[in-house]
Design a protein with these regions (language model features):
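Surface-exposed, charged secondary-structure patches
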Residues: 70-111
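Core segments of small alpha/beta cavity-forming domains
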Residues: 3-75
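Exposed beta-sheet edge and beta->alpha loop/turn motif
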Residues: 94-136, 145-164
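Extended hydrophobic/Leu-rich segments
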Residues: 1, 5-9, 88, 158
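Short, surface-exposed, charged/polar-biased interaction segments
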Residues: 45, 49-52, 70, 79-82, ...
Length: 164
């Protein structure tokens, strides 16, 4: 699942999934990896994204990709993913509860200069609806559930001060 050659790491997936849940999970991870790789390469090839995404989510991705492409931007760094659950809604739909860590991703211009920290560069949790479409599990929608506070050291200091 992890591919260090492209800086894509899957740190945790749930254990004990049945065959259908596993296929839905693999469909979700195919989407996540494809979108990361497309933003890294920025070569216009969205075939892997199109194979793992459907509906409004695919259109939304294409629009955001075109904006980045027109601006001459691409991404470098490391993407990390944790999946906490895969809940079947029916035989052809699942909801994947995931957490993405994008804090080690940088957006760079065509000449390699870092673009100031984008607003999306954070850790966040979201629910992905994955549907079985023409024999393949594809991401149909993403719903961000919460952003995780990036001030871990500050929180640790606060906790330490509470114990003094």
């Amino acid at each position: 699942l992890t591919d260090a050659s492209i800086g894509y790491y899957v740190d945790l997936v749930p254990q004990g999934l049945d065959a259908t849940q596993t296929q839905a999970l693999l469909g979700f991870l195919a989407y996540d990896r494809a979108t990361w790789e497309a933003y890294r390469k920025m070569d216009g090839d969205l075939s892997a994204v199109e194979a793992s995404t459907t509906g409004e989510e695919l259109e939304s991705y294409r629009e955001n990709y075109r904006k980045s492409q027109a601006a001459g931007e691409r991404e470098v760094g490391t993407a990390r993913m944790v999946v906490s659950s895969v809940e079947m809604q029916s035989g052809s739909e699942a909801v994947v509860d995931a957490c993405a860590d994008q804090t080690q991703i940088k957006r760079v211009s065509s000449n390699g200069e870092e673009i100031p920290k984008p607003s999306w560069q954070h850790k966040y949790s979201y629910l992905a609806t994955v549907r079985l479409v023409d024999g393949a599990w594809k991401v149909a929608s993403l719903q961000e559930t919460r952003r995780l506070i990036q001030r871990a050291s500050r929180l640790q200091l606060l906790r330490r001060s509470e114990h003094l």
